[in-house]
């Protein structure tokens, strides 16, 4: 197996759905299935925060979600937990700046997908040098899902990354909705990552379809 190509990674980032059990009011397995039917291109398991599952329950839940992703041939990424990603043989892992260092993550993950959240050009360059396949840049807009986020960057922050010669695939993160997706893509992102825009939608399927349309219209 060799590392994923830039072009392939860029395509996978189009509509990036992130979810844990506590992000849904409906059955999360059903929400994921609807999102996959609607056309998400990659999924990240993020079980964090108030009411999140722990221990064996968390692992079992992750396995259920992973099995559904496999049915649809969509990559399953684990947030912040390299050991779990390895245990599940996940397609990749996504880490933040405060998590395990990117060099050790790349070493452990081999050729699997490694994504890194970045807020500055320095962080971006460091992540690229040490093996990131893509960057998560944000928060672009205010978000209520993550309580520990950095200052909102707006689309200008994202455009700045491209102006500074960052060519690696980028997914926009934070407060992204159907209404503002086009702005994120136009600023230079390859795709959008969302939680509540799908997880709390009246119809996860319809909401995903609209996001997919917005992204392809704006690219």
UniProtKB/Swiss-Prot annotation:
GO cellular component, one term: cytoplasm
GO BP terms, alphabetized: thiamine biosynthetic process; thiamine diphosphate biosynthetic process
Cofactor field: Mg(2+)
Reaction catalysis annotation: 2-[(2R,5Z)-2-carboxy-4-methylthiazol-5(2H)-ylidene]ethyl phosphate + 4-amino-2-methyl-5-(diphosphooxymethyl)pyrimidine + 2 H(+) = thiamine phosphate + CO2 + diphosphate; 2-(2-carboxy-4-methylthiazol-5-yl)ethyl phosphate + 4-amino-2-methyl-5-(diphosphooxymethyl)pyrimidine + 2 H(+) = thiamine phosphate + CO2 + diphosphate; 4-methyl-5-(2-phosphooxyethyl)-thiazole + 4-amino-2-methyl-5-(diphosphooxymethyl)pyrimidine + H(+) = thiamine phosphate + diphosphate
InterPro entries: Aldolase_TIM, ThiamineP_synth_sf, ThiamineP_synth_TenI, TMP_synthase
Cofactor remark from the record: Binds 1 Mg(2+) ion per subunit.
Annotated positions binding 4-amino-2-methyl-5-(diphosphooxymethyl)pyrimidine: 44-48, 79, 117, 146
Protein EC: 2.5.1.3
Single GO MF annotation: magnesium ion binding
UniProt-annotated binding residues for 2-[(2R,5Z)-2-carboxy-4-methylthiazol-5(2H)-ylidene]ethyl phosphate: 143-145, 175, 195-196
Pfam families: TMP-TENI (PF02581)
Signal peptide: none
Residues binding Mg(2+), per UniProt: 80, 99
UniProt keywords, alphabetically: Magnesium, Metal-binding, Thiamine biosynthesis, Transferase
Pathway: Cofactor biosynthesis; thiamine diphosphate biosynthesis; thiamine phosphate from 4-amino-2-methyl-5-diphosphomethylpyrimidine and 4-methyl-5-(2-phosphoethyl)-thiazole: step 1/1
Entry annotated with the keyword Lyase: no
Keyword Metal-binding: yes
Homology family: Belongs to the thiamine-phosphate synthase family.
Role description: Condenses 4-methyl-5-(beta-hydroxyethyl)thiazole monophosphate (THZ-P) and 2-methyl-4-amino-5-hydroxymethyl pyrimidine pyrophosphate (HMP-PP) to form thiamine monophosphate (TMP).
Protein name: Thiamine-phosphate synthase
């Amino acid at each position: 197996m060799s590392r994923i190509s830039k072009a392939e990674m860029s395509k996978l980032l189009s509509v990036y759905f992130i979810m844990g059990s506590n992000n849904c009011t409906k059955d999360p397995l059903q929400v994921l299935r609807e999102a996959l039917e609607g056309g998400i291109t990659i999924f990240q398991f993020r079980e964090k925060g108030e009411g999140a599952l722990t221990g064996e329950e968390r692992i079992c839940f992750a396995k259920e979600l992973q099995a559904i992703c496999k049915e649809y041939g969509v990559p399953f990424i684990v947030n912040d937990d390299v050991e779990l990603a390895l245990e599940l043989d996940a397609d990749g892992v996504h880490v933040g700046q405060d998590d395990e260092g990117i060099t050790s993550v790349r070493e452990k993950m081999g050729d699997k997908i490694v994504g890194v959240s970045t807020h500055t050009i320095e962080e971006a360059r460091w992540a690229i040098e040490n093996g990131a396949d893509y960057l998560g840049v944000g928060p672009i807009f205010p978000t209520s899902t993550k309580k520990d986020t950095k200052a909102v960057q707006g689309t200008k922050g994202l455009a700045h990354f491209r102006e500074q010669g960052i060519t690696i695939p980028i997914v926009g993160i934070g407060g992204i909705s159907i209404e503002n997706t086009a702005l994120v893509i136009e600023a230079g992102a390859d795709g959008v990552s969302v939680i509540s825009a799908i997880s709390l939608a009246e119809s996860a399927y319809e909401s995903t379809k609209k996001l997919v349309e917005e992204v392809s219209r704006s690219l």
